[in-house]
UniProtKB/Swiss-Prot annotation:
UniProt xrefs under PROSITE patterns: KH_TYPE_2, RIBOSOMAL_S3
Natural source organism: Leptospira biflexa serovar Patoc (strain Patoc 1 / ATCC 23582 / Paris)
Keyword hit for DNA repair: no
Annotated KH type-2 domain residues: 38-106
Cited SMART domains: KH
The organism's place on the tree of life at top rank: Bacteria
UniProt name for this protein: Small ribosomal subunit protein uS3
Subunit-structure text: Part of the 30S ribosomal subunit. Forms a tight complex with proteins S10 and S14.
Length: 225
């Protein structure tokens, strides 16, 4: 099961929090579609800015968008011009004021989505895919991960038949739910068609603190009483 399912979705509530932080009964469908449109717009707008995560928080009077990127200068622009322009464009997706927070990713070499985007970009630039994959593996291991796996699929080097190749260093325990597994996916658009890039990184196991364990015990006791 761990080999097939998205490792982030499998660990929601265990090692990873939700990317959409809100709850609604009546407007669930409306809010969900707004979130999808906002994410697609920002990913397309800043496709070269290495955006690794977009977290959307909803409040009664406003919406907060937290954009995690390794290139904040490219997103913000000169004197914040890009942000103001984006805020104006985002107004058409929601009927509430939208605020944006730009959060810099300090170590993009260990973030799976950033690695996937780097590999896809170099494949589009016709770099040898094996050299690119091995270089990113070494960079991630030097960055401090305990394991990393990179897999690419498609017409590699323009071959007539599509195939899959993968390289791995360290260990990536996909079946261990407490393992902090990050996952990234990106498609490289080449003259021979699309090449899919998948990346898994493992940065150790998650063990809750005593305070978190006490909170869990209290929550279970409250549900059963």
């Amino acid at each position: 099961m761990g080999q097939k399912v998205n490792p982030i979705g499998l660990r929601i509530g265990i090692t990873r929090n939700w990317d959409s932080v809100w709850f609604s009964k009546q407007d669930y469908i409306k809010n969900l579609h707004e979130d999808i449109k906002i994410r697609r717009f920002l990913q397309k707008k800043f496709k070269n800015a290495s955006v690794v995560k977009i977290i959307i928080e909803r409040f009664p009077e406003k919406i907060n968008v937290n954009l995690h990127t390794s290139k904040p200068g490219m997103v913000i622009g000169q004197k914040g011009q890009n942000i103001e322009a984006v805020k104006q464009e985002l107004k058409k997706f929601a009927d509430k004021p939208i605020g944006m927070n730009i959060i810099e990713v300090k170590k993009p070499e260990i973030i799976a989505q950033a690695i996937a985007e780097t590999v896809a970009l170099q494949i589009e630039q016709r770099m040898p895919f094996r050299r690119v994959m091995k270089a990113e593996l070494r960079r991630a291991m030097r960055g401090g991960v305990e394991g990393v796996k990179i897999q690419i699929s498609g017409r590699l080097n323009g071959a007539d038949m599509a195939r899959t190749e993968k390289y791995m260093e360290g260990r990536v325990p996909l079946h261990t739910l407490r393992a902090k597994i990050d996952f990234g996916f990106k498609e490289a658009l080449t003259t021979f068609g699309q090449i899919g890039v998948k990346v898994w990184t493992y940065t150790g196991d998650y063990f809750p603190t005593k305070e978190e364990s006490d909170e869990d015990k209290y929550a279970v006791k409250r549900r059963t009483s």
